[in-house]
Each structure stands twice: as C-alpha cells, then as structure tokens.
Amino acid sequence: MRLSRLILPLIALSALAGCATNAPAPTANVAAPGPAPAPMPGYDWFLNRDGPEAILAYGVANSDEVKLHLRCKAGSGALELTAASEKPGREIHLESGGDTERYPAASEPAGVHDGELLTALAKSKDPVFQRFRRLGWIASWSDDERHIYAAHPAAKAGIEQFFIVCG
C-alpha cells in the first residue's frame, strides 16, 4: 500500500520537473548590416549656421544645386525639410538604414531650376533622422527611385553638429 501512495506524488513531481526545464533560447537570424553607400563625387553635406538657425544641405558646394535641405532653430527639435523634385508631389519620403518616414509636403515651382521644391515639417528625434545621424547617409524616394545622399568622411562631424544644435 505504501508504494501505491508514493507513485502518484512521484509521477506528479516528475511531470512538474519536466515542465520546468528550459528549452534552448531561439537564435536570432539577423543578417549583418550591409556596407554604407558610397559618397557621390562632387556632392556632400554642408552645415551652415546663421544666428540661432542651423542649415544642413546636401548638394554641390557653392551652387544652387541642392537635393535635400534641413533647417532648424537651435534647441527646437523641429525641422523644416526642402527636397528638390522633378514634378509636383505631396510627400517627402526619406529612408536611412531601414528606418523610413513619409512627411506630408507642399509643392511649389523651384524658380532657380526646372522642377519643384517640396517642403515639409519633421522632428529631429524621428527615427529616420537619428539613423541618418549615426550612419551619415539618408535616401529620398521619388517616383519609385531611390536617391542616396551619403556624406564624405569629413562631413560627418557637421551632421552630428547639426543635430546637437537642433536638439
């Protein structure tokens, strides 16, 4: 009789012990990030300070050829975006290192060159800008075409300074 009384608790105990064992943790199947896009010869990011305002522009030095323009007032955290476009649009679509954002935009004729200028508002803390800050490149999507704006090594300090100033 004693043995039958012990069998039931032993079975229950071994069942509990089986439930308590840890299964091996699943391994993450994360691919290593690809290499950063190469900077385009003749184009780069340029930082300009004018009083409390900071401007970060991607284009050709000392010219009107600017592809993307970010502006902020010091400490505001608010960005005004201006992007060159071949035709009128309703959004500025940006990507950096897998983070993407679409900003509703106003469109107006460029005046200085053929095409349009799209303007939108954003926040410097948006993930796409924080990734740009870390990686040194951002891409603009227009008509299913990706235009990459990668910094040359010397310009990366200006990108960091811009985001420090903007807050």
Per-region residue spans from a language model:
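C-terminal motif of bacterial Sec signal peptides marking the signal peptidase cleavage site
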Residues: A15-G18
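Bacterial lipoprotein signal-peptidase II cleavage site
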Residues: A20-A28
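Internal interaction segment
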Residues: T21-N22, T100-G167
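Post-signal peptide N-terminal segment of mature Sec-exported envelope proteins
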Residues: A28-G51
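Generic recognition of long tandem-repeat/solenoid scaffolds
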Residues: P52-A61, L79-A83, E116-A122
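Short, surface-exposed binding/anchoring microloops in extracellular/periplasmic proteins
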Residues: G59-R90
